[in-house]
């Protein structure tokens, strides 16, 4: 059995890791780190896991408690994973970090957007960006995987094939993305109080969202040239899910059948990417609770536009599910093990 530890187990992404790994036939969870709930039974923190997860939360000693594990999941806020990652890697063990600390390859860009000094530059140089469908070989060989953010996952999977095949303009990409409230995390926040987010939709962080450099980094790699995008996220009154509507210009006047063929070339063998055909478009309910990313598109001949829509569950494919998928790949397992949950409908 694979012995796994989870740092930050009581945040939403950490709790989703606990749920998925508890159901994984090849994994035993060795510890559930939580400073906020130290000594408290995990089922008291998350009643949904009563009689399923029987361990207690504990504040982990970074010096001693890593000895008995094979792989570490860090589900801590940005800036807090770096010391744990350094210590774990020094022991020759493997790490999947769900924070932003190792996603952005240029530390100066990371420091400018996150206002945190990067103190694990050696480890940053060894990190592999964990977009499972795009970098499978690199992930298999990695000691450290930087798990992608939720918005970047939904956007990069949608655009990667089109940019690689040079069928859309790189100059005028506009992304309108909508996220459920769990994307804001579990900490108390005035903006996510029920009475303020229920029956309410609002845009936020226009042009300043911290996922922008991560998105631009990955799209630039796909396009083979530096890209700048216009990204506007919105908070919508649902628990989980991300719907990204992406406006691009169809520079080669590619027809819908050809676009379907492009997506099929990249994703036909990818279990967790589902291409919707015949003009059907994704919806968040159809992926809720699952590791799927649904992608659909529409060609608008009147404007020469190619509009792409993607949907993911922000806590699964956008966080914990992709982390488990990456673990499977790193450890030589079939990548879908522990991730075969069907979406919840309605």
Curated annotation (Swiss-Prot):
<dbReference type="GO" id="GO:0003942">
    <property type="term" value="F:N-acetyl-gamma-glutamyl-phosphate reductase activity"/>
</dbReference>
<dbReference type="GO" id="GO:0006526">
    <property type="term" value="P:L-arginine biosynthetic process"/>
</dbReference>
<keyword id="KW-0028">Amino-acid biosynthesis</keyword>
<dbReference type="GO" id="GO:0051287">
    <property type="term" value="F:NAD binding"/>
</dbReference>
<dbReference type="InterPro" id="IPR036291">
    <property type="entry name" value="NAD(P)-bd_dom_sf"/>
</dbReference>
<keyword id="KW-0963">Cytoplasm</keyword>
<keyword id="KW-0560">Oxidoreductase</keyword>
<dbReference type="InterPro" id="IPR000534">
    <property type="entry name" value="Semialdehyde_DH_NAD-bd"/>
</dbReference>
<dbReference type="InterPro" id="IPR050085">
    <property type="entry name" value="NAGSA_dehydrogenase"/>
</dbReference>
<dbReference type="GO" id="GO:0005737">
    <property type="term" value="C:cytoplasm"/>
</dbReference>
<comment type="function">
    <text>Catalyzes the NADPH-dependent reduction of N-acetyl-5-glutamyl phosphate to yield N-acetyl-L-glutamate 5-semialdehyde.</text>
</comment>
<keyword id="KW-0521">NADP</keyword>
<dbReference type="InterPro" id="IPR023013">
    <property type="entry name" value="AGPR_AS"/>
</dbReference>
<protein>
    <recommendedName>
        <fullName>N-acetyl-gamma-glutamyl-phosphate reductase</fullName>
        <ecNumber>1.2.1.38</ecNumber>
    </recommendedName>
</protein>
<dbReference type="Pfam" id="PF01118">
    <property type="entry name" value="Semialdhyde_dh"/>
</dbReference>
<comment type="pathway">
    <text>Amino-acid biosynthesis; L-arginine biosynthesis; N(2)-acetyl-L-ornithine from L-glutamate: step 3/4.</text>
</comment>
<keyword id="KW-0055">Arginine biosynthesis</keyword>
<dbReference type="Pfam" id="PF22698">
    <property type="entry name" value="Semialdhyde_dhC_1"/>
</dbReference>
<dbReference type="InterPro" id="IPR000706">
    <property type="entry name" value="AGPR_type-1"/>
</dbReference>
<dbReference type="GO" id="GO:0070401">
    <property type="term" value="F:NADP+ binding"/>
</dbReference>
<feature type="active site">
    <location>
        <position position="150"/>
    </location>
</feature>
<comment type="similarity">
    <text>Belongs to the NAGSA dehydrogenase family. Type 1 subfamily.</text>
</comment>
